[in-house]
């Protein structure tokens, strides 16, 4: 047998071993109906595994145990092996989105099912298999390299699919207060599109939301001079807002975009001018524009149109995350090399998509990259992931650890 055939045979055996271990742990996690913000015991499973691998595990609870909704208590897991730098941290979430009507699923969403080459379950792609893959990768890595350089950590929350106020952001605040720094962060979100590893996210756009309230004066449609129509007052300003050019983007980010997602007004009667209008819009912005610049330009537009209006406007702003970017460097290179070694793919860097918990970690100075399974079915009925990708992903993750923590 040639050296090439020996290497290929060894790689196939490694993938098979990783695949079964990752599949088994994935199923154990997927059986838990951990609809946000309920972890439902997933982190206990991980803590037990990681403790056996030499990790110090710490549960962090934030929020009100008696509350419901966005202020409910959230369980988070911080696990670390090693006390030196660099620190490579895997960030993930055990919570999942609701299933919708389970009758629409081919297989029960919390009964993991293998069929047609896929593992079907809520959370299969987003993102319990990613957590399982990195856990297996870390176990194998520390078993083979017990004296490795640096440290390996896990930051796992059950508040990523919800309001994200008592999860990763609070854990990061605690770590910062302890001067416990993350050097490299690998977020296990499903980044791949057509094939495993074809895309990794080395940044994300910022997200700035706004709720516009326009207040006029209610009246009869036949007597507009006795009323002030908030719809008419808002229309021109909103039109200019949607047609404005905020920036031209750059090599890493597309131009900043704005989308109006909701407009609501009216009294239910066809002959009444309403008193108020509410509009909801969102900016996805690049590093070429700041939060303050977007707010200032928006207010300038509305101030101009409302200067001579009897109506008044107010905007309530909510920043969900600043844009962040990890330039090509050690972490990006480690990911690209590991992907190439396992799949033969030349990966593409991207900053597209929505926000992730990476937005809370990047401001600490950490390099942040998102790498996970394909995202074709996330948040959908019949969410699924290719079984063959599980072992490959674990092997990629292990390769990243080797690239960063071995001399």
From Swiss-Prot:
The active site is at 95, 160 (proton acceptor). Zn(2+) 1 binds at residues 93, 126, 189. Catalyzes the hydrolysis of N-succinyl-L,L-diaminopimelic acid (SDAP), forming succinate and LL-2,6-diaminopimelate (DAP), an intermediate involved in the bacterial biosynthesis of lysine and meso-diaminopimelic acid, an essential component of bacterial cell walls. HAMAP family: DapE (MF_01690). One of its GO terms (molecular function) is zinc ion binding. Its cofactor is Zn(2+); Co(2+). Binds 2 Zn(2+) or Co(2+) ions per subunit. InterPro entries: Bact_exopeptidase_dim_dom (IPR036264), DapE_proteobac (IPR005941), Peptidase_M20 (IPR002933), Peptidase_M20_dimer (IPR011650), Peptidase_M20A (IPR050072). The gene is dapE. Keywords: Amino-acid biosynthesis, Cobalt, Diaminopimelate biosynthesis, Hydrolase, Lysine biosynthesis, Metal-binding, Zinc. This is Succinyl-diaminopimelate desuccinylase. Zn(2+) 2 binds at residues 126, 161, 379. The lineage of its organism: Bacteria, Pseudomonadati, Pseudomonadota, Gammaproteobacteria, Moraxellales. Pathway: Amino-acid biosynthesis; L-lysine biosynthesis via DAP pathway; LL-2,6-diaminopimelate from (S)-tetrahydrodipicolinate (succinylase route): step 3/3. GO terms for biological process: diaminopimelate biosynthetic process; L-arginine biosynthetic process; lysine biosynthetic process via diaminopimelate. Gene3D superfamilies: Zn peptidases.
């Amino acid at each position: 047998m040639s050296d090439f055939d020996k290497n290929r045979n060894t790689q196939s055996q490694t993938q098979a071993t990783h695949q079964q271990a990752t599949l088994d742990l994935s199923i154990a996690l997927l059986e838990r109906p951990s609809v946000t913000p309920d972890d439902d015991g997933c982190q206990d499973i991980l803590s037990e595994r990681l403790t056996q691998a030499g990790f110090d595990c710490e549960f962090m609870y934030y929020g009100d145990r008696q509350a419901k909704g966005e202020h409910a208590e959230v369980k988070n897991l911080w696990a670390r092996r090693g006390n030196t730098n660099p620190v490579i941290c895997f960030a993930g979430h055990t919570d999942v989105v609701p299933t919708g009507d389970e009758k629409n699923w081919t297989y029960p969403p919390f009964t993991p099912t293998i069929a047609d080459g896929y593992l079907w379950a809520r959370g299969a792609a987003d993102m319990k298999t990613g957590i399982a893959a990195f856990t297996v990768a870390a176990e194998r890595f520390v078993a083979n390299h017990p004296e490795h350089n640096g440290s390996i950590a896990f930051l796992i929350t059950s508040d990523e699919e919800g309001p994200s106020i008592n999860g990763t952001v609070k854990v990061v605040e605690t770590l910062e207060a302890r001067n416990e720094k993350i050097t490299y962060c690998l977020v296990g979100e499903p980044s791949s599109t057509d094939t495993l590893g074809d895309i990794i996210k080395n940044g994300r756009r910022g997200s700035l939301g706004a709720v516009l309230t326009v207040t006029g004066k209610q009246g009869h449609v036949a007597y507009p001079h006795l009323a002030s129509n908030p719809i008419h007052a808002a229309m021109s300003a909103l039109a200019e807002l949607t047609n404005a050019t905020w920036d031209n983007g750059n090599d890493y980010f597309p131009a900043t975009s704005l989308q109006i997602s909701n407009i609501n007004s009216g009294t239910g009667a066809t002959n009444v001018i309403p008193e108020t209008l509410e509009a909801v819009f969102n900016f996805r912005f690049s590093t070429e524009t700041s939060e303050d610049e977007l707010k200032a330009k928006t207010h300038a537009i509305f101030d101009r149109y409302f200067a001579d209006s009897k109506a008044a406007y107010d905007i309530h702003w909510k920043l969900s995350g600043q844009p962040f970017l990890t330039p090509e460097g050690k972490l990006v290179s480690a990911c690209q090399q590991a992907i190439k070694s396992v799949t033969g793919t030349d990966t593409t860097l991207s900053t597209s998509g929505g926000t992730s918990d990476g937005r809370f970690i990047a401001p600490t100075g950490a390099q942040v990259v998102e790498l996970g399974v394909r995202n074709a079915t996330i948040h959908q009925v019949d969410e699924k992931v290719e079984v063959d990708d599980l072992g490959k992903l674990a092997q990629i993750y292990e390769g990243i650890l080797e690239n960063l923590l071995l001399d």
